[in-house]
């Protein structure tokens, strides 16, 4: 019996001999060509994605991005703030116009009546809804006072007579809330208070009635700021406590309104470990900012992309730290010199005066007051009496905390401080009957009191 022939059939079809017919062969060739083109297209597409991803990653590494709540990217911080040469340093100008100030080593006695022409007491309204734990910064705004209480993450606005006006925002994780109130600054151009929420990585802008106007993400970390027109002057570097992971360098950075750095750095010696080379706070007046360099004992003015030394302090005719000490600064050298010689870490400024609280270590670390007229460069050093029943025995030790106007200093005083010597202090001689009665009725846990002292022109 003849065996049956088995013919293998291609999926494309075949004749009885298993040979693909010309038509089917052509179809297969076309499909193979199509597959090759398709594979080539896919290959090019994947290659293009790889190139785009590489460029995007490179761009990502060299560009700013918003920081998420509680996040910290050390690489980005170092790249933009420390090492990026595309961000130019500040231009230092007017180095030859620096005022020279000699800080006395001994504490002179000065009758405050020869310095101040009038006094005014403004008790801040007290309520459980707006209790102030501590005043970290007070800003005199048109018609009101803005007060920062960092410890309790609160910012309050009080009327000029001390009546409560409003609280800025609420604590929380929502976009329109804040986790802390690390710093505040006044945006004079837009008449708004800007709050730095460092934990939440954002800036919140409020009008003077407490209405939220804008929320912006941070692109890098900083702990103090000043609003200079459309730009923000930021003080970056190590902060305190839970923010100790921030890079251990202190830098000034000028950022535009979008948060991008446009000026950076500061041409002085590097900071000593675990401490800023700068004073505790920057001070803002109009569209300029001021800060103190603690190693060079110099007060600087920053205006736009320029900065200038405006005041240099000496002790016994020379700077506290020699050139060699500045270049090889240590905590021990810094602390020892601070413990033995007078120094200042803050500055308050108006169009008329510069006020510098001065610590006198050999006088029990009491704070005296150096006053400088910006018109005449004349200087007055206000000492503190050792008579603790007098007005001038304890008021200067509290500050001052700023200027209420061009010639009036603001002191913030806790009620229990006033009550300690209220029965004997001559503060009553300078207050109205109503103010004296109010002083008498203060309670230790009441909100702080503002004391306005008007300077006598010199």
Which sequence ranges carry the predicted segments?
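Short coil/turn segments at the loop-to-beta-strand junctions that recur within blades
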Residues: 128, 169-176, 217-223, 268-272, ...
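Blade-loop segments of beta-propeller domains
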Residues: 124-135, 152-154, 163-190
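C-terminal motif of bacterial Sec signal peptides marking the signal peptidase cleavage site
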Residues: 52-54
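Conserved blade-ending motifs and adjacent loop-strand segments that build the rim/top face
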Residues: 310-331, 375-405
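Short beta-strand elements that form the blades of beta-propeller/WD-repeat-like
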Residues: 144-149, 191-197, 231-243, 284-300, ...
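Repeated scaffold domains used in trafficking and secretory/extracellular systems
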Residues: 134-137, 179-184, 220-227, 273-281, ...
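Asp-box/WD-like beta-propeller blade repeats and closely related beta-sheet repeat scaffolds
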Residues: 180, 197-243, 248, 265-270
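Blade/loop signatures of beta-propeller domains
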Residues: 69-121
């Amino acid at each position: 019996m003849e065996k049956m022939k088995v013919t293998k059939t291609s999926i494309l079809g075949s004749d009885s001999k298993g040979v693909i017919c010309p038509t089917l062969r052509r179809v297969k060739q076309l499909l193979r060509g199509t597959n090759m083109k398709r594979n080539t297209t896919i290959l090019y597409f994947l290659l293009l994605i790889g190139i785009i991803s590489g460029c995007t990653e490179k761009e990502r590494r060299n560009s700013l991005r918003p920081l998420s709540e509680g996040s910290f990217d050390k690489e980005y911080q170092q790249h933009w703030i420390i090492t990026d040469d595309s961000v130019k340093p500040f231009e230092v100008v007017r180095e030859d116009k620096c005022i020279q100030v000699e800080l006395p080593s001994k504490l002179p006695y000065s009758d405050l009546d020869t310095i101040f022409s009038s006094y005014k007491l403004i008790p801040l309204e007290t309520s459980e809804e707006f209790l102030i734990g501590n005043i970290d910064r007070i800003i005199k705004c048109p018609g009101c006072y803005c007060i920062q209480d960092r410890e309790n993450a609160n910012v309050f606005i009080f009327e000029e007579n001390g009546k409560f006006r409003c609280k800025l925002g609420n604590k929380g994780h929502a976009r329109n809330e804040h986790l802390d109130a690390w710093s505040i600054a006044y945006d004079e151009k837009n008449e708004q208070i800007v709050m730095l929420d460092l934990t939440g990585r954002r800036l919140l802008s409020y009008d003077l009635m407490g209405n939220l106007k804008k929320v912006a993400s941070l692109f890098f970390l900083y702990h103090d700021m000043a609003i200079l027109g459309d730009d923000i002057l930021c003080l970056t570097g190590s902060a305190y406590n839970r923010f100790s992971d921030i890079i251990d360098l202190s830098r000034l950075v000028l950022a535009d309104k979008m948060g991008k750095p446009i000026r950076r750095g500061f041409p002085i010696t590097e900071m000593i470990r675990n401490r800023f080379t700068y004073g505790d706070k920057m001070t803002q007046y109009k569209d300029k900012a001021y800060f103190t360099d603690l190693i060079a004992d110099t007060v600087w003015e920053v205006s736009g992309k320029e900065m200038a030394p405006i005041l240099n302090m000496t002790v016994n005719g020379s700077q506290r730290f020699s050139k060699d000490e500045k270049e090889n600064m240590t905590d021990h050298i810094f602390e020892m010199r601070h413990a033995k010689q007078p120094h200042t870490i803050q500055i308050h400024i108006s169009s008329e005066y510069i006020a510098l609280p001065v610590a006198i270590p050999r006088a029990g670390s009491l704070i005296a007051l150096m006053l400088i007229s910006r018109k005449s460069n004349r200087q007055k050093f206000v000492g503190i009496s050792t008579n603790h029943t007098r007005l001038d025995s304890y008021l200067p030790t509290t500050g001052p905390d700023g200027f209420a106007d061009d010639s009036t200093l603001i002191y913030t005083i806790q009620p229990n401080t006033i009550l300690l010597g209220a029965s004997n202090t001559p503060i009553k001689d300078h207050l109205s009957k109503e103010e004296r009665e109010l002083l008498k009725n203060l309670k230790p846990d009441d909100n702080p009191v503002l004391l306005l002292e008007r300077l006598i022109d010199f």
